[in-house]
Amino acid sequence: MELNSTEKHVETITTHETHVLSNTKSVDELYQGRVSSTTSGSEENIATLEENDNKKLTFTTKREWFEFSLLIVGIVLAMFMMSLNSTVVAPAMSIIATELNALESQTWIATAYLVALNSFQPLSGRFSDIFGRKSVFIFGIVLFFAGSLINALSTNIDMLIAGRTIQGFGGGGVMSMTFIIVTDIAPVHLLPRFQSMLAVVYGLASVVGPLLGGAFVDHATWHWDFWLNVILAAIAFIIMVFYLKEPKEKTQTSFMSKIKRVDWLGTLFSTSFIVCLLLALNWGSPYGWGSAHSIGPFVAAGVSLIALIYIEGWVAHDPLLPARVLLNPPVTIVYGYMMCLGLTFIGTLYFGPVYYQSVFGADSTQSGLRLIPFMVCLIGGSVGGGFLIRKFPSIKYYIMIGAASNLLGYGLFYTVSETSSWGQQAGYLSFCGLAFGLSQQNSILTVQAIVEHRDMAIATSCINFFMMLASSIGIAIYQTLYQIFLKQEFAKLPLEILAGAQSYGALSNFLFIRKMPLELQRPVITAYSDAIHKVFILPIAAAALGFILTLFFRNVRYGVKPDEKRDEELSLDEKNVTL
């Protein structure tokens, strides 16, 4: 297998490797940047990002500025709708499942989307290298639009799950392509700010999602959770069709030659591995971990993984997942950290509303509002990091601060009980939001500085893939632990309280707790609180592991030129020789 070279390299981004705007100057006329990665044999390996201060993003006409601005708006809309869709149904899942008479299939409303999203996300980076950024991006938006429309018109759970699956395939392409295209079109010296913008939009939509979802459920209908994405997808599609174009060499390549470049076996087995793994995790709880529903997919996932490793390492000429990327230790560590971040992030977004509704009696809108401190600090961390990075260029330390904040936030949130004040909860969630804001875009910058430019698209898409994969696995694990701990807590209740709660349906649906007599509510609320309390041990463990991983991050320094670094090292060596 080919591993990442340890020699220093400098790769220039040219107009043949970037996208151009319709009716505007080519990208290399708008800016010229260079990304460098160096690895030394010293104890602390330093990777650097070199910025070109002589070239800036300039426009000769107002039309050029307007078209570039529209392109950015389209990218932001695409990211917003994709992220919004991941969480907008979180506070409404119980209500949707109740209305569709499908409480036993409730988790599939989220899982179907995440399984499909993770299946296509690792493919999108390589496909964009073959078929072009625009083709993959537009394809993703069209699928997302179709899935959203099906969901908005759903009258039964099967129709809804089918729509969520189609949405997921589209979302997998959209999410990765936003970061990849921004890297293509943004000047290097502005890249941290552009990626911070995407991280802000992702985090903002993730937190606004539960708020909007709750408001639609409380004051309109849950169908608007999906009609909103139909509208956003249509607008994003129109903008991208007119203002994002491929380089000429991409459009002149025949379709059949592109088809021949696809690693079809790698695509088949990577998709099979992800789908089977997530199915096994989601079927374990309802059918039993020893049942054929669980063991069968686990075995299939294992076989698919072995086949995938063999094909990518020894068979594929143009592998879907190059070993030089996945087996590059500094890159692997970043991916591991993003999995830890995804595992904690999804716990907040999905089980935060459950906690607020079951224990504190909040409605769907209120449970979304309680996530605002998380959102505010996420935005602050992302924007602040993007602006500070040029003055304090050691990216590793931003991520370390974020990881420490994540561990502190979840450690404190674990102490929340039925009597905790809203101020305490808001303060604890603020640390968690800051963690995500400081981590996501800086992790992307780290990986992009380490890998070769030809692997930039696949390396970037894998960052989002591993984060979302962990989120998908996390939902299944959280739900399983939640059900196990809830049964344990219910078993502790006196028989008369248990029977009363059962008669009101409060044991299977926390929305019915407040319909019971007051003397029955308190013990049942305590049972829900204790169960969720135990579930939140998992994000604490993930946050702790994530912090440990950041200690081994390569120190990527933004804006430090390789020549300056070498001169500094040579000067130190000369002093040592003199001594």
Question: Predicted segments — roles?
Answer:
Residues Q121-L265:
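Helix-loop-helix hairpins in multi-pass membrane proteins, especially solute transporters
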Residues F68, L153-R164, T221, T415-L429, ...:
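Helix-loop junctions at membrane interfaces in 12-TM secondary transporters
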